[in-house]
Structure formats: structure tokens, C-alpha cells
């Protein structure tokens, strides 16, 4: 392998000649051969947005020449294009401030920027610390990149998937509005409900999650940049944080602002905890929806079988013809993983000792993973399951007509105790509810027909 020699304050080190990173990245690769979890590329893109904006701000404030500013902006745009992904090899498991990833970006930006200067025959050079990292610390850059990445992924990936599934459920809700089925509470028969009403509960869960997500993501717009090492802003111009936030907003289209309290921004990540709490709430709702779907689709002959779902693949390696609710199982596993991630994020956020929380990479890793899993899970569940949900009306009608809980409609006419006697007699003697009611003498056939109307029970008002 061809190598070149790079150096840092620890001395010289060999770096692969075809890679754009420098000495500190190479040391990190050697010092932290831990796990397979690469630092998400979205974090790198968040850093690129930050370094780009910092170059513009530093130029405005007289800290960088125009040539250096242009070169850094060019390098950051190259990163954002996805052309340089291979030059960011570091794993999540590194220093808790994310210093190695900050330097990885600084080194790649300076390498590409110096090529830009050389190509344009400009007699200047760019240093990863003195120029790319001008007015910054890893302590304020990593949480800034983290917030930029999280906000963008919620906007561009999670929310569209949430809307997609929500809209499908709304279509099913409207389509099945006239189908009356038996309701169930405590896994026991209850009073009737429309299939459309049941699905409306699922849909409204996603409506509420969309609102909660919109509220919680607002706090992610606060950026730590400008706080530098401990929140005081040492070595940074007083206007630097606001200018960087302005330029990030200009390039992304999102209204980022510089946090009004940088001491908080460096040592606490409660804003991410709140965001992930919403992700956990969404995971809980998806768990409930997926469980309901697979129970209602259970069968085909010895289960509830009130709905059918698409048959996507063989379900068993030993039982021929068996088809399983695989999409529901996938979504419930996603939900469990997100709930586990929430525990990690909450505990890690609590570990801000004095002026700095040093669990930033694991907070970022788990939150991004939750966003990806939920987004991919909802889209896949929607496309391969939810869109194909159909009622099995013969079974729905059979359960409805057999249900003893229709007796609830008699309460206002004969009282709770007599209605309970009718239901118990029917269950014990294997009678229909109508037969039991007439045999007790509490109601006539005409009264039963007038009072027991499922269509009235689902819309009592």
C-alpha cells in the first residue's frame, strides 16, 4: 500500500496515499478499533454544513482570506455531494466529545481545499486547525453538527414516512366506515364498533405523533456553535455563533439559531432526549398498530381472521402453505429497538459532568438509528402490508351476531342486572342472545328487535 507522511503534535504517522484524512484521523483509526458502527455520514454532512458556514462567518469577521473561504466552501460542497464519503472511516466509539470526527472533517476539508488552491494557482495553504476549525472547538461543533443532522433527517426522512402511513390508514378508515364489527376490551368481547372507527384510532395516533414531532424538533434548531471549549466563547468573535447559524440556515433552508446559553448547549442534551421521547411514543403507537393488525389477521381458520393482509413470502420452512404477518413482526422489533435506544439516550444525556457531556457520539448514533428504523419501518409496513388490508366480512358478521355484549343495549330498558342474567344464561346454555332474552321473559321479540341494533350502538349520539 502506498503511503504518505502526515504529522500532528504527536509526531509523524503514515497515512494511505489515496485517502484525504490526516494524522489525527489515522491515529483514531488505530486507537479505536471498536465495533462496526461507523460515524453516520449524516453527521459528517452536518459538520460540512457547519464548516462551510464557519468559513463564511470567519471571512465576514476578517479571520480568513477570500481565497481560503472559497476553498473551504468548495471542499464542504464536495463533501455534501456525497463524493467523499470513503474518507470518513471513524467509528462511533471514540472520544465522547467527538473530537476525532471533528478533526476527520477538518483534515479532509483542508486536504481538498489545498488541492483547490493549487489548481487555481493561489499561493496560500489551509491548516485543519488554524483555518477550518477557526473559532471552534469539538465541544461546540459536534453538538452543532448533531442538531443539523437530526433536524434534517426528521424533516426529510421520518416525517414523510409518517405522513405516508397516516394517509393510508385514513383511506382505510374512510373505506371501511360502514362495516360494523365487535369491539374488544381486555381481549374479551365488547360492544360493537365500526372497522373504520377502529382504524381511526390508529390514524389519530399518527396525527398526534406528527404534532409532537413538530413541537420537539423545534428545540433541535438551537445550535451550540460559538460556545467553543466550555461555553464562554473563548477564541471566537462575539458575533460568530449568530453568523454561523445564519449561514447554515441559508444553505439548508431550516431556521437554525445560535443557542442563547452555550453552557447548557455543551453539557446538556435534553433537547435530543425530548425528541427521542417523541420517537419512543411513535414506536409505542406503531407497536400497538402492528399488534392489532396481526391479531385481526390471525388464522386463516383458527384465528380471528377479521381482516386479510398481503401474502408477501412463504412463512415457514416446515409447514407448507403457511404465511406469517412478517411486516407486523418487523415493525414490532423496530419499536422494541427504539425503546431500548431511548434508555441509552436518556442515560447518556444525564452524564454531563461540569461543562461538557462526553457521551455525544452514542447519543447521536442511537437517535439517528431510531429515526432510520422508524422511517424505513413505516414505509415498508405501509407498502407491503397496510395498503393491502381488507375486511373479511363473513367472519366479521359472524362474530358480531354471536356476541353476548350486544346485551349492553338493553341496560337502559331493563337494567344492568337483568341484562347480565340474559347474557349469562345465553353463554351457559348455548343460546343466542335473542333466545335467552325471550326465555327470561324480560323482553318480547319485538322489543329485542327494536332495542338491539348494532348500527345504533356504534353511533349512539
From Swiss-Prot:
The active site is at 186 (proton donor/acceptor), 316. Keywords: Cytoplasm, Lyase, Tricarboxylic acid cycle. The record marks 329 as: Important for catalytic activity. Its main location: cytoplasm. Signal peptide: none annotated. The keyword Metal-binding does not apply. PROSITE patterns: FUMARATE_LYASES. InterPro entries: Fum_hydII (IPR005677), Fumarase/histidase_N (IPR024083), Fumarase_C_C (IPR018951), Fumarate_lyase_CS (IPR020557), Fumarate_lyase_fam (IPR000362), Fumarate_lyase_N (IPR022761), L-Aspartase-like (IPR008948). Pathway: Carbohydrate metabolism; tricarboxylic acid cycle; (S)-malate from fumarate: step 1/1. Belongs to the class-II fumarase/aspartase family. Fumarase subfamily. Involved in the TCA cycle. Catalyzes the stereospecific interconversion of fumarate to L-malate. This is Fumarate hydratase class II. The lineage of its organism: Bacteria, Bacillati, Bacillota, Bacilli, Bacillales.
Amino acid at each position: 500500500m502506498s503511503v504518505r507522511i502526515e504529522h500532528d503534535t504527536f509526531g509523524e504517522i503514515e497515512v494511505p496515499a489515496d485517502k484525504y484524512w490526516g494524522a489525527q484521523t489515522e491515529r483514531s483509526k488505530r486507537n479505536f478499533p471498536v465495533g462496526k458502527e461507523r460515524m453516520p455520514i449524516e453527521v459528517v454532512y452536518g459538520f460540512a454544513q457547519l464548516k462551510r458556514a464557519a468559513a463564511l462567518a470567519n471571512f465576514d469577521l476578517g479571520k480568513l482570506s477570500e481565497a481560503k473561504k472559497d476553498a473551504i466552501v468548495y471542499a464542504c460542497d464536495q463533501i455534501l455531494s456525497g463524493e467523499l464519503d470513503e474518507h470518513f472511516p471513524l467509528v462511533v466509539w471514540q472520544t465522547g466529545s467527538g473530537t476525532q470526527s471533528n478533526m476527520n472533517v477538518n483534515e479532509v476539508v483542508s486536504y481538498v481545499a489545498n488541492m483547490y488552491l493549487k489548481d487555481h494557482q493561489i499561493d496560500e495553504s489551509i491548516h485543519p486547525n488554524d483555518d477550518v476549525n477557526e473559532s471552534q472547538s469539538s465541544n461546540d461543533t459536534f453538538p452543532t453538527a448533531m442538531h443539523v443532522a437530526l433536524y434534517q433527517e426528521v424533516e426529510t426522512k421520518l416525517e414523510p414516512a409518517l405522513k405516508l402511513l397516516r394517509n393510508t390508514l385514513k383511506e382505510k378508515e374512510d373505506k371501511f366506515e360502514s362495516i360494523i364489527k365487535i369491539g374488544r376490551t381486555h381481549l374479551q368481547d365488547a360492544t360493537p364498533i365500526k372497522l373504520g372507527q377502529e382504524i381511526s384510532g390508529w390514524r389519530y395516533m399518527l396525527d398526534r405523533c406528527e404534532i409532537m414531532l413538530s413541537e420537539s424538533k423545534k428545540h433541535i434548531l438551537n445550535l451550540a456553535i460559538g460556545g467553543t471549549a466550555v461555553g464562554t466563547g473563548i477564541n471566537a468573535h462575539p458575533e460568530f455563533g449568530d453568523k454561523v447559524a445564519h449561514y447554515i440556515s441559508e444553505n439548508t433552508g431550516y431556521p437554525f439559531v445560535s443557542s442563547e446559553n452555550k453552557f447548557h448547549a455543551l453539557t446538556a442534551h435534553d433537547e435530543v432526549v425530548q425528541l427521542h421521547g417523541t420517537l419512543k411514543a411513535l414506536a409505542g403507537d406503531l407497536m400497538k398498530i402492528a399488534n392489532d393488525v396481526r391479531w385481526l389477521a390471525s388464522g386463516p381458520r383458527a384465528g380471528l381472521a377479521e381482516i386479510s393482509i398481503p401474502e408477501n413470502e412463504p412463512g415457514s420452512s416446515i409447514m407448507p402453505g403457511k404465511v406469517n404477518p412478517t411486516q407486523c413482526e418487523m415493525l414490532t422489533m423496530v419499536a422494541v429497538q427504539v425503546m431500548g435506544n431511548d434508555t441509552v439516550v436518556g442515560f447518556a444525556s444525564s452524564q454531563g459532568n461540569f461543562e461538557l457531556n462526553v457521551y455525544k457520539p452514542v447519543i447521536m448514533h442511537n437517535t439517528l438509528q431510531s429515526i432510520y428504523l422508524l422511517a424505513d419501518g413505516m414505509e415498508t409496513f405501509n407498502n407491503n402490508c397496510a395498503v393491502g388490508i381488507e375486511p373479511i366480512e363473513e367472519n366479521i358478521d359472524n362474530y358480531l351476531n354471536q356476541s353476548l355484549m350486544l346485551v349492553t343495549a338493553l341496560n337502559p330498558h331493563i337494567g344492568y342486572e337483568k341484562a347480565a342474567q340474559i347474557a349469562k344464561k345465553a353463554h351457559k346454555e348455548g343460546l343466542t342472545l335473542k333466545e335467552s332474552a325471550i326465555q327470561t321473559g324480560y323482553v318480547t321479540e319485538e322489543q329485542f328487535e327494536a332495542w338491539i341494533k348494532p348500527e345504533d350502538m356504534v353511533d349512539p349520539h
